[in-house]
Amino acid sequence: MSKILLGFMGAGKTTVGRLLDPNFHDMDELIVNQIGMSINDFFAQEGEEAFRKIETATLESLLANQAKIISPGGGIVVNPHNRDLLEKNPYNIYLRVDFDTLYKRIENDLAMQRPLYLNNTREEFKKIFEARLPIYEKIATHIIDVAGKTPEEIAEIIRCL
């Protein structure tokens, strides 16, 4: 049985995942290792559709192998097939955070500049964020409001589920 950490980029999925299990499965890291380049470079060379296919195959493999903690990218919910896979999982934990907090986190994370952030204005980015919110909420079996909580507090809440 997998615990899947859902949420928009910058919500803290990777940070919390590492606290829950040092051997957790960060899907973006797995994909980068598989494709041999950064996700930004892959997006630029191959496009989002090619990335989403690899993302789906990675999710299917992790679920089939019953990975304990999985942290997918925030766009995992874009693909209807991924949503179907996620809806069958008993522990989908949505790390919910408001847009302004999230945007500041992403803006300040100079080491991890993401294509969705780089290629959109703040207003366009907010529309994408708002479009995904109801999908995260529908798929989630548990919702944790993470603003104002430390990663350690969030991890402890998840351990108690």
From Swiss-Prot:
Its main location: cytoplasm. Binds 1 Mg(2+) ion per subunit. Its EC number is 2.7.1.71. GO terms for cellular component: cytosol. This is Shikimate kinase. Mg(2+) binds at residue 14. One of its GO terms (molecular function) is magnesium ion binding. Keywords: Amino-acid biosynthesis, Aromatic amino acid biosynthesis, ATP-binding, Cytoplasm, Kinase, Magnesium, Metal-binding, Nucleotide-binding, Transferase. Substrate binds at residues 28, 52, 74, 132. Pathway: Metabolic intermediate biosynthesis; chorismate biosynthesis; chorismate from D-erythrose 4-phosphate and phosphoenolpyruvate: step 5/7.
